[in-house]
Amino acid sequence: MPKPRATLKQSPADFRVAEQIDFPLTGHGEHLWCYVEKTSLNTAWLKREWARLTDCLPKDIAHSGLKDRHAITRQWLSLPAKYSAQLPDSGDGWQILERQQNERKLRVGAHRYNQFAITLRDIDADRAHIEAALTALTRDGFPNHFGDQRFGHTNRDKAQRWVERGQLPKKHDERAQVLSTLRADAYNAQLDARLAAATLHAPQPGDRAMLAGSNSHFTIEAVDDALLARLASGDIALGGWLPGKEKAPLPPAVTAWLEAADATQQVAVRYLEKYADGGWRALTVCPRDLQYHWPDAHTLHLAFTLPRGSYATALLASLFDLHDASSANSPSDIPSRPQNP
């Protein structure tokens, strides 16, 4: 059955996301943490603006996750506390909601969850059908694809050129972008292969299992009722390989995917095995606290929480044939760095 159509991001207010940390700040220290709300601004632009306003070095302004431009977003940024007086409380399109000092600088990936409030418009499907799909999604989760934001506008082409050279970029940011893009692309291809084979929820010995809400994982030795119950409850999910240096044997499903991959993908994986550290990512994820209501027959409002690194657009794409209204008005100079939610 075709997916129902829906329009996303008709305005920035239709897509709201807020980072959530799960640890207290010390209230003192050399670093100023700011919880900032911004509209129609991406993270890279705001960091450059703060550097301009304060004369702080750009490298000393830190973020946890990179957030999309076409949204209203709340996120944490930090900078040395000595620049606090030079940093205004607001600017064009942004406002600091909270300031706290902390002993440590903000690190990438410090937040644990993202809370979303999303409005979809122009829906052309029966309400009961969509509500049944939402119930199933809450129970079974959705395919945990890296979203298009991860790849920017030209990152795949740039990464492929470095693979063809067999070299790494010298600049740290560009190097991280190349490896991130290639790993995400390979992971998405594995996930698509398991979807096509209908094995996303069918574990086999040798598969890697991920503990929900963490990066901890283990190798499945045997498939029994206890393991299947943990999968069904969402306590664990099957894991997909983020290619890189890997000491343990790869699961049979990953080996089969790699053997069937085209030459370009195989060369990219060998490149990653030389230059990147291996990792694992859950193939499915269940949203927390999912709620919805219908303002009218063709408009759906969704609210839910996802772990850091999972994409709301992937959740939505599992349910709808999406038309992203913001893409029609995207200028070509939007930074193309990968977006880590």
What is each stretch, according to the model?
Residues 1-341:
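Non-catalytic, substrate/partner-engaging modules appended to enzymatic cores
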